[in-house]
């Protein structure tokens, strides 16, 4: 959307305010922003070694490197998650709307802080059908200036309700199933003492992160907010196509 906006394609009023000549008015450019927000509850475990201690240790990292060099196996061959699953937040839904990703590590800020000093796992949960919508808008006519991105995560009651249900499903699996009893799981974050839905979502959102799935800001379809047609051609223009994830309506 930024390329279109600086080129004069988008919301006419906003672009004129930035001194940009209007080539084509297209209200939907930069609107309808959607993303998958990942909640990252953390559980302490016993009788099971997570990767925390190995990653926090210089010697452990050395062993990880050697395993990869000589065996092409181990943590350096792993993907972002080792377990994935889908469930419904409510049985009445036609299809699953929650996705789990499980990692044998735990940390406060993924990629920006050390692993915890205990054995822990992170069973993340994300609403894959969010109803919240954000927007992205340029701040100047200079392509070197970053746009303003407003995600509006959890701005609808439905998204907050689904988030609470997802976190409670994770809690039930971790704390109430026979499978995990031998590992004596303890909810480190957000904390089993938090039972109110709104409080649970608020606490968990402090450690939530994007899964980097933004779509929708040049959506395909008909109507005022649609930017491209089913051939990816921009409405109102000739021979201009948008070919990336922004064309996905949802």
Set out the residue ranges of the language-model regions.
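Glycine-rich loop(s) and the adjacent beta-strand/alpha-helix scaffold that form part
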Residues: 1-67
């Amino acid at each position: 959307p930024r390329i279109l906006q600086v080129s004069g394609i988008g919301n006419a009023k906003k672009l004129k305010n930035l001194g940009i000549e209007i080539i084509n008015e297209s209200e939907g450019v930069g609107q309808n922003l959607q993303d998958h927000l990942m909640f990252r509850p953390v559980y302490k475990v016993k009788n099971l070694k997570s990767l925390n201690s190995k990653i926090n240790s210089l010697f452990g990292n050395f062993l990880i490197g050697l395993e990869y060099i000589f065996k092409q196996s181990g943590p350096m061959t792993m993907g972002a998650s080792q377990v994935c699953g889908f469930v419904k937040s409510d049985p009445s839904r036609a299809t699953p709307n929650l996705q789990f990703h499980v990692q044998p590590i735990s940390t406060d800020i993924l990629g920006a802080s050390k692993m915890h000093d205990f054995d822990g796992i992170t069973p993340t949960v994300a609403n894959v059908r969010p109803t919240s919508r954000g927007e992205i808008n340029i701040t100047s006519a200079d392509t070197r200036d970053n746009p303003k991105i407003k995600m509006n995560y959890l701005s609808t009651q439905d998204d907050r309700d689904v988030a609470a249900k997802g976190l409670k499903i994770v809690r039930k699996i971790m704390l109430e199933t026979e499978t995990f009893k031998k590992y004596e799981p303890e909810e480190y974050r957000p904390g089993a003492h938090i039972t109110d839905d709104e409080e649970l979502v608020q606490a968990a959102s402090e450690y939530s992160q994007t899964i980097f799935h933004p779509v929708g800001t040049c959506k395909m379809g008909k109507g005022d907010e649609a930017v491209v047609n089913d051939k990816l051609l921009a409405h109102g223009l000739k021979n201009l196509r948008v070919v990336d994830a922004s064309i996905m309506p949802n």
